[in-house]
């Protein structure tokens, strides 16, 4: 259920923590310098995992654990934060932008209301509304099961805390952070960059604005840091850092072009575009389970928002989008370099 392994001798330890949803586990990390330790992320909210997690932590010798960094607000990264603080007297650190969204989710009725209003703009038919009401209600309920009350809120795009270089890298969430060990050229990137999975970037009430633009800028920001390896929240370490970042950028270019091609001869709502794209395992929207329908719809919304922001598409009064500037779907037309 919880497994400890040493990733970089005497410096980085990884905790593999079970969770009951894909991909089945999440990583937390311990960074040890001298006898001082900090923890990065707090696993899934399952009280039965708390004692096994603490037992695994005790296997790291001469490790005075003082601080818990939260890379982002999602419950598989915040789950046991309060319990760990209570048992180990930790200080919890996260970015203010994410904490503000945590507070928003705790008001379930308001959260559902805002999302249903957004669905109207996405062109979702009434027949689908109950499905999305249930999904958003479930997200809010799970959030309340894992209440989070940080001790330190990061306010800036870049800070140094406990000798850790913290960068704001939004997109997956508004206040997602990456944590860099400058002297080793190593970083902990939460869900920003994963080895084979493409991170969900969706436009929702708790990830507002232009999240795909934020995500692409975050990838480019990390690419400029010159890192040897990344330690993400799932799958495994990444040591072909820039190659993987370039793959992820090209994946988004491909998806943006799919949206553009879908709109070449039609004006469509975001819901209609979502139905015309292929999703996980090459499935159509209609074949997805409710949670993956939510992810597909909100990802399409983020793609369309990005295209709108660079002047390629525009919506009419009926929320149907059409092309207003033709492009060849070249990366230089779509992505800031």
Q: Where are the language model's segments positioned?
A:
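Conserved beta-strand hairpin/beta-sheet module of binuclear metal-dependent hydrolase folds
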Residues: 2-59, 178-195
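Active-site HxH/HxHxD metal-binding segment of metal-dependent hydrolases
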Residues: 48-49, 56-160, 274
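Metallo-beta-lactamase
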Residues: 37, 44-46, 140-142, 165-256
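Aromatic/hydrophobic pocket-lining residues that form the small-molecule binding cavity
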Residues: 78, 215, 300
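C-terminal regulatory/interaction regions
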Residues: 261-337
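A short catalytic or substrate-binding loop motif that flags glycine-/basic-rich loops and adjacent residues
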Residues: 21-23, 154, 170-173, 337
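Active-site/pore-lining binding-face segments in mid-to-C-terminal subdomains
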Residues: 52, 73, 77, 242-264
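Divalent metal-coordination and catalytic microenvironments
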Residues: 11, 31, 41, 72, ...
